[in-house]
């Protein structure tokens, strides 16, 4: 893909309204400019690349035909929405995407009126778009609603729940299925494209509906014969029978990179009403050969030179492993020792560190696609009959399977191990991917053991500990590297519910959980404070908590979780239950959603780095009543 040095057409487009003034003959050139701009902008700043390169033509066609923002476009997940951001007045800021104060990584209602629904998690678009279509109907508004969902998003049950409901209602809704995993041969594509233009035309639609009314008055066998004949003709070239059974008129598949075909078809579909589904076939990374050949590598990228691509050479030596790498190595080591171990992930093979496991133990590796609920109940079923399941999942995605976690695993006290990645502060992917809540929603569940490692080696030992337990267990760990502690090859089970005294001090005791232990130790040097690595959020080491309360003037809990219901709350509840009064400062994440930015910047913003912890403790201690015990919650400037 040759680089374009200037973008004369693209630079004219500051809104979709301006786009719609262009003659249709200019749109191919605009697509070339937009694709080149997107490639070089993301290559400079980092971000999601391959998906956006694959939706250039679709995005142009949608904004060209539909009167956005009055007509509603709802993007699923949002990885593919970078071209949408560019065409809706955010071109000059695209280089700031995922950075503190910059553009949000996904569509956000707070950022633009063209972002009609905030996304980040998969398979929500059809439900949200259906809600908007119903609202338009209830209010007597004539606007159109379009949901754009990828084939990956269609692996989740929620998408089919919404399709079934929309079809039953007969809602005026267009769903565009962006299929970037399959290809169609030129012959099938040509026939299918012709059929789609025919079926989406107003003449066919009028005849079809008129024929329905006539046939409905005739004997049922004749109606059924006509329906099956239509299905047979369409089924020869289109895999749309499932959608038709749900009440949708199905069109496609068509080439999602053929702008003229897209515009012609969308223009026809715009004139129609009722549930419609357009199936388009696209190529992830379209126009950039390296991304086309390896879309996984170019899905989310750090800055790189587009002339040479992402270099996959040997990594620079580092004293610190990432927590994901620690999990990956432990899983393979444990699987080699225990033939009953099985690994499960909901479409996060690379992100959760299961690539090596899937290659070494393919028969014991289960990627259930974007189906978090299924992944947890699948693990429960496996555990019932003697397998030892390990579910590798992001903190934010485990939220989607909360009922299954309670009802199917914990209630039956089944030995399922949850390896929870991206816990706490995550960073550039913003509030939709932050792991701010897991300690709160996990520690209230009976039978579940909850652990948070302070370093890489402890993570390995906690995973081993949880695996050996004959009950549900969760190990939650942050994104990125640990403090640099060497990981032992051996595995040793930790004493259940026992904390570790890391530093003896005077006056102040800091009870730190997980990744906050390292900065707490650094802050303690200037405070001469005692530091405890709590290790277990549940069961809590109540004996050590009470000992710290008896021997110190002030207790401080530190966690990378929201304070409400978190680890600090567990300490507070323990003290209250035992009737112990001691000044207690709860320090953690604030009571708001964390915006995007680097993990380091967000930790500083939340005062969870060493300096932030130090200042929080000093500020609180300075105003602490000498004769009165109190409990204070401290979260990035919010006390209460």
Swiss-Prot record:
Catalytic activity of the protein: D-glyceraldehyde 3-phosphate + pyruvate + H(+) = 1-deoxy-D-xylulose 5-phosphate + CO2
Pfam families, per the entry: DXP_synthase_N, Transket_pyr, Transketolase_C
Residues holding thiamine diphosphate: 79, 120-122, 152-153, 180, 288, 372
Cofactor(s) this protein requires: Mg(2+); thiamine diphosphate
The organism's place on the tree of life at top rank: Bacteria
Subunit organization: Homodimer.
Sorted UniProt keywords: Isoprene biosynthesis, Magnesium, Metal-binding, Thiamine biosynthesis, Thiamine pyrophosphate, Transferase
Record family assignment: Belongs to the transketolase family. DXPS subfamily.
Biological processes annotated in GO: 1-deoxy-D-xylulose 5-phosphate biosynthetic process; isopentenyl diphosphate biosynthetic process, methylerythritol 4-phosphate pathway; terpenoid biosynthetic process; thiamine biosynthetic process
Function according to Swiss-Prot or TrEMBL: Catalyzes the acyloin condensation reaction between C atoms 2 and 3 of pyruvate and glyceraldehyde 3-phosphate to yield 1-deoxy-D-xylulose-5-phosphate (DXP).
Pathway: Metabolic intermediate biosynthesis; 1-deoxy-D-xylulose 5-phosphate biosynthesis; 1-deoxy-D-xylulose 5-phosphate from D-glyceraldehyde 3-phosphate and pyruvate: step 1/1
CDD domains found in the cross-reference section: TPP_DXS, TPP_PYR_DXS_TK_like
Name of the protein: 1-deoxy-D-xylulose-5-phosphate synthase
E.C. number(s) listed in UniProt: 2.2.1.7
Gene Ontology molecular function, alphabetical: 1-deoxy-D-xylulose-5-phosphate synthase activity; magnesium ion binding; thiamine pyrophosphate binding
NCBIfam families: dxs, PRK05444.2-2
Cofactor remark: Binds 1 Mg(2+) ion per subunit.
One term under GO cellular component: cytosol
Record flagged with keyword Transferase: yes
Protein residues bound to Mg(2+): 151, 180
């Amino acid at each position: 893909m040759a680089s374009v040095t200037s973008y004369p057409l693209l630079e004219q487009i500051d809104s979709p309204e301006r786009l719609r003034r262009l003659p249709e003959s200019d749109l191919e050139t605009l697509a070339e400019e937009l694709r080149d701009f997107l490639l070089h902008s993301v290559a400079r700043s980092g971000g999601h690349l391959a998906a956006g390169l694959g939706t250039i033509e679709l995005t142009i066609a949608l904004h060209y035909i539909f009167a956005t923002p009055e007509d509603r476009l709802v993007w699923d997940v949002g990885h593919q929405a970078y071209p949408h951001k560019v065409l809706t007045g955010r071109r000059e800021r695209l280089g700031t995407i995922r950075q503190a104060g910059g553009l949000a990584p996904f569509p956000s209602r707070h950022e633009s009126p063209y972002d009609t629904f905030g996304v980040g998690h998969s398979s929500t678009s059809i439900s949200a778009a259906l809600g908007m279509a119903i609202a338009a109907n209830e209010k007597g508004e004539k606007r159109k609603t379009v949901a754009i969902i990828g084939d990956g998003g269609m692996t989740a049950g929620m998408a089919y729940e919404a399709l079934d409901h929309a079809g039953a209602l007969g809602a005026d809704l267009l769903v565009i299925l962006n299929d970037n995993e399959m290809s169609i041969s030129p012959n099938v594509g040509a026939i299918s494209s012709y059929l789609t233009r025919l079926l989406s035309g107003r003449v066919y639609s009028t005849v079809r509906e008129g024929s329905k009314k006539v046939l409905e008055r005739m004997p049922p066998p004749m109606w059924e014969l006509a329906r099956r004949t239509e299905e047979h003709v369409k089924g020869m070239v289109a895999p749309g029978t499932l959608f038709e059974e749900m009440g949708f008129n199905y069109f496609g598949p068509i080439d999602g990179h053929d702008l003229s075909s897209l515009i012609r078809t969308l223009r026809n579909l715009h004139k129609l009403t009722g549930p419609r589904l357009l199936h388009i076939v696209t190529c992830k990374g379209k126009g950039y050969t390296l991304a086309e050949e390896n879309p996984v590598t170019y899905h989310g990228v750090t800055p790189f030179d587009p002339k040479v691509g992402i270099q996959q050479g040997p990594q620079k030596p580092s004293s610190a492993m990432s927590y994901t790498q620690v999990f990956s190595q432990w899983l393979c080591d444990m699987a080699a020792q225990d033939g009953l171990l099985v690994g499960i992930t909901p479409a996060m093979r690379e992100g959760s560190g299961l690539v090596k496991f899937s290659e070494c133990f393919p028969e014991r590796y289960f990627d259930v696609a974007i189906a978090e609920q299924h992944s947890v109940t699948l693990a429960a079923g496996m555990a019932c009959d003697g397998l030892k399941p390990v579910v590798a999942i992001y903190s934010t995605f485990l939220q989607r399977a909360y009922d299954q976690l309670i009802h199917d695993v914990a209630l039956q006290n089944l030995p399922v191990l949850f390896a929870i990645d991206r816990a706490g502060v995550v960073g550039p992917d913003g509030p939709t991917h932050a792991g701010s809540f897991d300690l709160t929603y996990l520690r209230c569940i009976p039978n579940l053991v909850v652990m948070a490692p302070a370093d890489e080696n402890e993570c390995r030992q906690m995973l081993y500990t949880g695996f050996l337990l004959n009950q549900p267990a969760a190990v939650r760990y942050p994104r990125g590297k640990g403090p640099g502690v060497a990981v032992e090859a051996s595995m040793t089970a930790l004493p259940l519910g026992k904390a570790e005294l890391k530093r003896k001090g005077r006056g102040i005791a800091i009870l730190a959980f997980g990744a906050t232990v390292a900065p707490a130790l650094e802050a303690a040097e200037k405070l001469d404070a005692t530091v405890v690595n709590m290790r277990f959020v549940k069961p809590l080491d109540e004996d050590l908590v009470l000992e710290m309360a008896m021997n110190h003037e002030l207790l401080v809990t530190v966690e990378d979780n929201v304070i409400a219901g978190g680890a600090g709350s567990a300490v507070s509840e323990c003290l209250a239950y035992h009737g112990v009064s001691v000044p207690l400062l709860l320090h953690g994440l604030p009571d708001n959603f964390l915006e995007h930015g680097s993990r380091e910047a967000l930790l500083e913003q939340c005062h969870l780095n060493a300096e932030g912890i130090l200042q929080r403790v000093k500020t609180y201690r300075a105003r602490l009543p000498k004769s009165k015990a109190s409990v204070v919650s401290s979260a990035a400037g919010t006390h209460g």
